[in-house]
Amino acid sequence: PNHQTFRNTPLETRANVAYFGTFGYELDVNQLTFEEKEIIKKQISFMKQYRSLFQFGTFYRLKSPFTSNETAWMVVSHDKTQAIVGYYRPLQEVNVGYRRLPLLGLDEDKMYHVNGLDLYGDELMNVGLIISDSSCGENKDGIGDYYSKLYILKERKENE
């Protein structure tokens, strides 16, 4: 937890925010459990895998943290074959409606694989990515205050 506010932001959310910046942790690694160290190792591997996309891709701010309880960022490769969307919700909401997040910067004629679905760029940019969570006020692991999720989009060729 933060030593001043005693809030405990999950390691997943810390990493999901840090990927889009300088990728660092503000914590005492000596205080981490073995499980937390293993989680951080996986997060570092993820960062290494997508480092060039985060560093050299085109960045979009999809939702501003200053206008609602949601923030969303996106980075798209220059050839528009892959993208990563970061969605962040600091405070849990109860009984919220069905939500979609319109994306930016994709190729409207390319098909992208995301969340087990194949969707065209024009659909993702005009209709949006489904971002509703399934908690609906229930206490589920990983869904609550300081919730975040990354969506990995990869181009899917028609014959694949």
Please provide the spans of the model-predicted regions.
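Active-site-proximal substrate-binding groove within the catalytic cores of carbohydrate-active enzymes
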Residues: 1-123, 139-143
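C-terminal beta-strand-rich structural cap/linker in extracellular carbohydrate-active enzymes
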Residues: 122-160
